[in-house]
Amino acid sequence: MNVSSRTVVLINFFAAVGLFTLISMRFGWFI
């Protein structure tokens, strides 16, 4: 795995975590 692919994976991972955190906060953690 080269550096560019790893960077893309990290960006997608952090984007997914951020989106999940936003949804969790919006629903007050009652999921």
UniProtKB/Swiss-Prot annotation:
Q: Which domain of life is it from?
A: Bacteria
What keywords were assigned to this record? Cell inner membrane, Cell membrane, Membrane, Stress response, Transmembrane, Transmembrane helix
- According to the record, the segments passing through the membrane are 7-29
Compartment annotation: Cell inner membrane
- The question of whether DNA repair is a record keyword is answered with no
Q: Which InterPro entries match?
A: YncL (IPR049611)
Induction: what does the entry report? Expressed during stationary phase, in minimal glucose or glycerol medium and at 45 degrees Celsius (at protein level).
Q: How does it sit in the membrane?
A: Single-pass membrane protein
Gene Ontology CC terms: plasma membrane
What the entry lists under NCBIfam families is as follows: YncL (NF000537)
Name of this protein: Uncharacterized protein YncL
User: Which species is listed as the source?
Assistant: Escherichia coli (strain K12)
- Originating gene: yncL
